[in-house]
Amino acid sequence: RLVWDRHTGTLTGRPGAQRLAVTSGGTIPDRGLFGVFLASDTGKQPRRVGELDEEMVYESRVGDVFVLGASSWRIEDITPDRVLVTPAPGQPGKLPFWHGDTPGRPAELGRAIGAAVRKLSAAGEREAAAKLEQAGLDELAARNLIRYLAEQRAATGYVPDDRTLVVERFRDELGDWRVVLHSPYGDRVHAPWALAIAARLRERYGGMDVQALHTDDGIIIRVPDSDEPPPTGIALLDPDDVGDLITQEVGASALFASRFRECASRALLLPRRNPGQRTPLWQQRQRSAQLLEVASQYPAFPIVLETVREVLRDVFDVPALTALLRDIASRKVRVVEVETQTPSPFGKSLLF
């Protein structure tokens, strides 16, 4: 909305820029939910089943089955503002999710938590209890925490900390392989790491539906329909290539599409048609998708670059992940692998 004269070094507003800034300005993004309605209803007002987060709708396709409430539903159609479904009783489906603005644990805090766990694990029971009581825990809480760490060490032989990451492999109740990476470094590091690991596994297994979940305390990978255990070294990625791999994977994700819409809105590329009146979210999504389709042909388009920066540095913490992978490559942080019959105590807390 500005003209930059590189010869004179001046910026001037284009015609209508002032009105556009007044009517469409603001930095708080519009976010919303897709309504879920029964597709079989023929009345004027179809019955409403519930709501889904827009990112989940972006990741869903016609024919997918999901669970809402106590029932399973099959997607029959996805329109710009709603999802039409039919009942799918007895069929397993994926669980819906709703994203909030809760930032994950910073890598610096995760490193400090890992260091504290390492010192507690190395100390004797009395010394550890004294340290925990000095930190404000009562006797019962300190005893429970010490027992929790001891049970994890008994199950896997290791307790994950800032210098030791544990990769645990086991079969779930369906016979599928589960891989749990225990790490204290936080969700902003684990989210892009999980994305990269899943991409590598899909390449290895020929496009198999590898599911990767992430939390502040680790990563859970599910590898279905495989008799062989997942390969060793699953978490060992090249720190020089991981940034490009994550950028490639993020570019086609629902997260990138939603963040692009927010960046384009802040840049006044999705102006409101009527001052003082919000544009319906489905119209914003539609216009944003059209803009992204054109902008994706120009990798240096400023809004594309800003969206990439926001995803890789604000939502994720790719620099911290790269630094961690370099520490692993230089043996400053070790990765140990164990195979268990059932999930360890730490693994159970991640799975359930």
Label each residue range with its predicted role.
Residues 48-60:
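Short alpha-helix capping/helix-loop boundary micro-motifs
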Residues 1, 68-69:
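Short amphipathic alpha-helical interaction segments
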Residues 31-51:
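Short, basic/aromatic beta-hairpin or loop at an interaction surface
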Residues 71-78:
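Short beta-strand-centered aromatic/proline hotspots
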Residues 79-96:
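Short, solvent-exposed secondary-structure boundary/capping segments
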Residues 1-33, 96, 104-352:
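Extended, highly charged accessory segments
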